[in-house]
């Protein structure tokens, strides 16, 4: 290509220099018009060719220069949460999960993650009409390393001021959030096995832990989840849990329990009892097994005993006490 272009450039200069400057406007001497008639078409073609090849080379050079230029450095990932102050986050979208539970997706900057430890929660706040603040803890369910957004899965409780407030929010509204508040720090291969007993929205801290452990390819912890709900329609995050169980059959098992049998239900029904735990979680009580419990107060009372005052763990009671477990083996979210 270069061998062709150099002679072409010479030809263009030669032709352009021979074209009379005023040939286009005033009569010329006899015979001179032949030069103009022949010179203009050739000159136009040559100039066009010169422009084409010059442009092509210039374009290639520009493209090569762009390709060779170093990519702009990525912005470092930062944490959006502040443990000492409430930060307003804008609601991006809402996804209905069950008749009374929805996923609320909040916006972050592209290079921001929420800034959670696992397992941890945050506190949310809004002011009532009388100006009094309502503050409630919630556990985000999105991946701790996710950037650009984070999720809450929140069940609506009639008469519950915060849950009703969040369920009445529209995209563009903001919610004040502070944290994180560490609950039970999780480390790789910290336990040989973990038994989880959850009820209703008590699945959220369990899901956070399950997701964190299963994405760690170095971790070998076996996780057994017993998840109790009123009806099959009330099971929160079932699709996500089933997907994780299918992808990790040697590490994660889920048993769903509902209050009363329905026509097509094949799983266990009724309360989470000592017998049900022994049948579906035989690892309970074994060496280096930890039991996590989270659910509504009536379930907590019958399974593990309620938490103590000022957010302390309290004594182990109920079914887990009957199985010989103590505070050393059990953690209540």
Question: Over which residues does each language-model region extend?
Answer:
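Reductase modules of NAD(P)H-dependent flavoproteins
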Residues: 25-52, 61-65, 226-333
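Hydrophobic/small residue at the entry helix of a nucleotide-binding pocket
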Residues: 201-206, 299
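N-terminal mitochondrial targeting presequence
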Residues: 1-36
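Ferredoxin-reductase
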Residues: 72-173, 229-231, 259-260
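A short, basic/flexible loop-to-alpha-helix module at the beginning of a structural domain
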Residues: 179-190
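Histidine-anchored nucleotide/phosphate-binding helix
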Residues: 207-217
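Membrane-proximal, acidic/low-complexity disordered segments on the non-cytosolic side
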Residues: 55-83
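Structural motif
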Residues: 193-195, 290
């Amino acid at each position: 290509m270069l061998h062709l272009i150099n002679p072409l450039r010479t030809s263009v200069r030669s032709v352009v220099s021979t074209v009379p400057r005023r040939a286009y406007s005033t009569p010329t001497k006899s015979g001179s018009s032949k030069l103009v008639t022949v010179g203009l078409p050739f000159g136009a073609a040559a100039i066009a060719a010169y422009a084409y090849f010059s442009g092509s080379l210039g374009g290639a050079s520009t493209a090569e220069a762009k390709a060779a230029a170093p990519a702009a450095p990525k912005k470092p990932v930062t944490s959006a949460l502040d443990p000492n102050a409430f930060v307003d986050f804008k609601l991006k979208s809402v996804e209905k999960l069950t008749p009374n539970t929805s996923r609320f997706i909040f916006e972050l900057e592209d290079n921001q993650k929420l800034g959670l430890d696992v397992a941890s929660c945050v506190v949310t706040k809004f002011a009532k009409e009388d100006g009094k603040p309502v503050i409630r803890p919630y556990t985000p369910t999105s991946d701790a390393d996710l950037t650009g957004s984070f999720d809450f899965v929140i069940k609506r409780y009639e008469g519950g001021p915060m849950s009703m407030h969040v369920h009445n929010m529209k995209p563009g509204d903001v919610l004040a959030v502070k944290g994180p508040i560490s609950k039970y720090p999780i480390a790789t291969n910290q336990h040989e096995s973990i038994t989880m007993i959850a009820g209703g929205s008590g699945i959220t801290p369990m899901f956070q832990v399950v997701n964190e452990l299963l994405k760690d390819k170095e971790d070998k912890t076996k996780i057994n989840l017993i998840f109790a709900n009123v009806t099959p329609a009330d099971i929160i995050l079932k699709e996500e849990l089933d997907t994780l169980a299918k992808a990790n059959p040697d590490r994660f098992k889920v048993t769903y329990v509902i209050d009363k049998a329905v026509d097509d239900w094949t799983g266990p029904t009724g309360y989470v009892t000592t017998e049900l735990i022994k049948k579906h979680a035989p690892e309970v009580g074994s060496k280096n097994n930890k039991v996590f419990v989270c659910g509504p107060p009536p379930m907590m009372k019958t399974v593990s005993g309620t938490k103590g005052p000022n957010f302390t763990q309290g004594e182990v009671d109920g079914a887990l006490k009957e199985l010989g477990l103590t505070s050393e083996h059990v953690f209540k979210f």
